[in-house]
Structure formats: structure tokens, C-alpha cells
Amino acid sequence: MDKTIYSKKIAESLSSGNHPEEFATLFVTLLRQLVMGRPVSREALGTALGWSGQRVATVLEPAPGTEYDEQGNIIGLGLTLRETPHVFEVDGRRLYTWCALDTLMFPALIGKTARVTSRCVATGRPITLTVAPEAVLQVEPAETMVSLLTPDASPDIRCSFCCHVHFFASPSVANAWASTHPGIELVPVENAFGLGHLIAHKLLEDSERNTA
């Protein structure tokens, strides 16, 4: 796997290839709002960005997986207030992520350390991590693996990518699962973190370029 090419594909898939630099700016800002543990209105997001409501809507529209509450506030896009198998605790606030890789890349985007609790998708064994912006500080079991898949052309990255990206308690368990799931690549947590770090920095670079 060429990590640079792969990270670029993931970053592009997040925005469905549309307005990639503007989307990166919106995405990073939205994550930093969601990590406060509250729904984010489009108005509040626009204020944080210094954008009009129409510009927010235009950039957000190509992301079909965006989650909203009954009042139309944003409650999830990668990082979510809705329960998933991946618990992502920051500053004592309990949030969730769509997939295993999110837990490894979001600390770099929000600039905070996260305590992650998940389970092996094959055995149900608990998996815990402490992930800082620059390193994985702790992982249990130590041999935890992550499954990866190259996203297809679908605009919905949650279905085309996130639903296939899991934690596994050991290489043997991961290999057994992958044998019945074509196209899957398995990597140790540290390698997955390195990939997530590249994706995060690509998004941060795009965001900074858009606001320069």
C-alpha cells in the first residue's frame, strides 16, 4: 500500500471529490465543534467558519452520511453523538466514531488526546487505546489489528469505507475474518495510526490553503 496515495484517496472521498479544500475547512471546524459534545447548528458552523449559510449548505451537501437531529442540527460526520461500537472520550465527554481509523486520525485534527474503547468485530473482545495527536500512547491487546479497504466511487464514505474498517484482537483473528471479505488489507494499529496521521495532515493542509 502506498500510504500517500491511499491517504489522498480517503481525503478526497470525504468530500466526494467536490470542493475538497473548502470541505476540509468545514470538516475540521465541525469536528472541533462536535467534540464539545453538543449538536451543531448550520448557523453556528457558519459563524465559526465565517461563511454564509448558503456556502455551508453547498459544501456540506455532497456528504450524504451527515447525521442530523430532529431540529436539523448536525450531530455526526465521522465523529458523532450517536452510539457506535467505537467510543471516543475527550476531556471527559463521551462521543463515538464511525470506524476504527477515525479514532486514530481525529486526535490530530482536534488537537486533543482521546481514550478509545471498542471491541474486536470478530470475537467481541474489548480493545482500548489512548491516542494522542502525535502517537498511540497505549493499546490493549498489544497485537490489535485494523482492517482497511480502498473506498469506491460511492459518495457515501460511511457505506463504501467505514463499514469495513474494524479493530481485531489479534492477527490470527483478523486473517480469519479477512479470508471471507475480499479486498481487505490488515495492518497493525501503529501502521493504521501512521496512515490516519497522513490523512489528518492532508486535511489540515487543504484547510490552511483554503483559509490562506
Curated annotation (Swiss-Prot):
It comes from the Bacteria. It holds the Pfam family HTH_15. InterPro entries: MerB, MerB_HTH_dom, MerB_lyase_sf, WH_DNA-bd_sf. Coiled coil: none annotated. Keywords: Lyase, Mercuric resistance, Mercury, Transposable element. One of its GO terms (molecular function) is alkylmercury lyase activity. It catalyses: an alkylmercury + H(+) = an alkane + Hg(2+). Its EC number is 4.99.1.2. It is an enzyme of class 4 (lyase). GO terms for biological process: response to mercury ion. HAMAP family: MerB. Belongs to the MerB family. Cleaves the carbon-mercury bond of organomercurials such as phenylmercuric acetate. One product is Hg(2+), which is subsequently detoxified by the mercuric reductase. This is Alkylmercury lyase. It comes from Pseudomonas putida.
